[in-house]
Amino acid sequence: MASATVRNVPLLDDDTIPFGEEDEMRDPSRAGQKYTHPYVTFFHLFFRGAAILIYMFCGWFSDSFITSFVFVVLFLSADFWTVKNISGRLLVGLRWWNYVDDDGVSHWVFESKNSESYQSRVNKNEQRIFWLGLILCPVFWGLFFLFALFGLKFKWLLLVMIAIALNAANLYGYVKCNYGANKDLNSAATDFVKTQFFKNAVDIMTRPSGAPPPTNVRPTGVV
């Protein structure tokens, strides 16, 4: 197969109401709620969290490695599909995908929606949860990799490597979407950590004590 090409493009617009925002369009008072996509936010964390918990505690319920392996892989697969196709697009306006053209060339596309109208609708709580879940779970699997490696548990090592591959693929794809396909990943990751740390520090210092959280979502018909 021919070598792959990479490009970073804006996320395509359409005239449909964003999934999960139909009630918000009918009732503008819902725009200020804490989570505008509560179900998407829940499942963004549920599948990957469940995979970690099953891996940690499967020995309490079954001695069968095959059973544990199947359940963990099922949850990892569900998580990979959900994060790649749903939560990234709805929670932060990012999407990455791949296609092969008629000449057999593989193209990797990293899309981002950076328009002011969209960014003004992004829920900051959901955005923070998205990135924390995307980053922290690979860290856990990295620790499990070390435990399995030094504990000489090679059959579990295979399972952990599958988990790392699936989690790292989404993390890599969304970092590329957020910072550009041509930017070095190490510098992009460093910039991301600095940006998030600065934002959290500013929020803590500037938010009045006991004040309600700011409302960042405004109803609009633009995706």
UniProtKB/Swiss-Prot annotation:
Instruction: Give the UniProt record's GO annotations in the biological process aspect.
Output: protein secretion; vesicle-mediated transport
What membrane topology was assigned to this protein in its record? Multi-pass membrane protein
- Transmembrane parts of this sequence: 35-55, 56-76, 129-149, 154-174
Q: Which organism is it from?
A: Drosophila melanogaster
* Acidic residues bias: start-end ranges: 12-25
User: Which InterPro entries does this chain map to?
Assistant: TVP23-like
Q: Which Pfam families does UniProt cross-reference here?
A: DUF846 (PF05832)
Q: Where in the cell is it found?
A: Membrane
GO CC annotations? Golgi membrane
Q: What is this protein called?
A: Uncharacterized Golgi apparatus membrane protein-like protein CG5021
* Keyword Membrane on entry: yes
Q: Which family does it belong to?
A: Belongs to the TVP23 family.
| Top-level taxon of origin | Eukaryota
Locate the region Disordered: 1-30
Supply the alphabetized keyword list.
Membrane, Transmembrane, Transmembrane helix
